[in-house]
Swiss-Prot record:
This is Lysosomal-associated transmembrane protein 5. It is found in: Lysosome membrane. It comes from Homo sapiens (Human). Keywords: Lysosome, Membrane, Phosphoprotein, Transmembrane, Transmembrane helix, Transport. The lineage of its organism: Eukaryota, Metazoa, Chordata, Craniata, Vertebrata. GO terms for molecular function: protein sequestering activity; ubiquitin protein ligase binding. One of its GO terms (biological process) is negative regulation of activated T cell proliferation. Belongs to the LAPTM4/LAPTM5 transporter family.
Amino acid sequence: MDPRLSTVRQTCCCFNVRIATTALAIYHVIMSVLLFIEHSVEVAHGKASCKLSQMGYLRIADLISSFLLITMLFIISLSLLIGVVKNREKYLLPFLSLQIMDYLLCLLTLLGSYIELPAYLKLASRSRASSSKFPLMTLQLLDFCLSILTLCSSYMEVPTYLNFKSMNHMNYLPSQEDMPHNQFIKMMIIFSIAFITVLIFKVYMFKCVWRCYRLIKCMNSVEEKRNSKMLQKVVLPSYEEALSLPSKTPEGGPAPPPYSEV
């Protein structure tokens, strides 16, 4: 084994990076196809968000961009699968870039889930300012930090295929509507823990793909170096081909002795 290959780890937390990356690529390809089918069925059945008669230019642009994005997700996932199978490290770069963007959007989604908390803290700071163990300045500072998070969450106005609240069909995003304060806080804590767990898993999968990229790149560089050092092999001509070749006897020189059987 080449010493450079030994420096690249082929496992990540007891999992082979090539197997994990291949499984991830197959999963993304299947999910892209299912997402395209689901979106097409919604448009065909004329859901409220997809009726052409009720949408303007913005809704039409949003619908077209949704299909374009799903198609790009499928192409990038297929590129990842081809890159792993055929050892083309460059085909892994689009997926790595997509994962970075997806991770940033997930962070903004997590920050956007705290958009309703500043109002609770303001109410608590006004009603419990005298009996609270925390100083009012601390509560105001925390409220200011959460307001900054709210400002960051304003950049979540992305198309509907990436809008977290528009995809909240199962109501797994905590909301303060018809929910007591204590229950809402508990739901936010559970939601944050679960979402952070998902982010950690995304980082782990990104690490697997990155190590697979380095491994394939190192393997290709070793193979190219090995091929460059190989000597060119020349195949000798047969007897008939040698007789048909022009004579290399210099002009005026002695002719070679005739061939004779012993």
